[in-house]
Amino acid sequence: MRQAADPNDRAVAAALPRRRTAEFLAGRSLLRHLLRLTVPERASTPIRADANGRPLLDGDPATGISISHDGLAIAVAVGRGQRVGVDVQLPAPHVPDSLLHRCLGRHAQDVIPLSEHRRGVELAWVWTAQEACVKAAGTGLTGSPWSIDVPPGSREGQWGGYRWISLRDRSHTPLSCAFSLSRFPSDADGLEATCS
């Protein structure tokens, strides 16, 4: 997969703080790789951000894209004819009860008795599903991801017009994808979402 960074991505990276450049280019490189596999005609399309910061393929609103990184973990998603969101999260070493109550709501009592490590892991899995949903919706944190009901241990669910999937059987690092249940108004041929 190792390829030179896309010239458009390098230009954007040049304006970023130095500490963010490598992370940004790694995320874009993985996204470009997935685009080459799924929508090859869009692999070199410039990427811009909408008013809320969501990445978009310039001139192609019918192909949803999403990028997430946390430390060295990177995840991307592409959806032909769909809005998509992806989130990857390294578990926190310490999770206060107040954060569990905030993000898990009525399910917090199921996680509070767990070991500190398991609390962090389970919260990370739940948070990735919540965050993937609001990324797909294009609202980010203003969409109150913590209010999305994701029961601990869940592998899939639905929130509004979005379906989410936690890749618990495929990833050791908490990673979830969300995608719209309805099509973008476009000429896209069918619905197809890929998460990596």
Question: Where do the model's predicted regions map?
Answer:
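Core catalytic alpha/beta fold that binds nucleotide/phospho-ligands
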Residues: 1-196
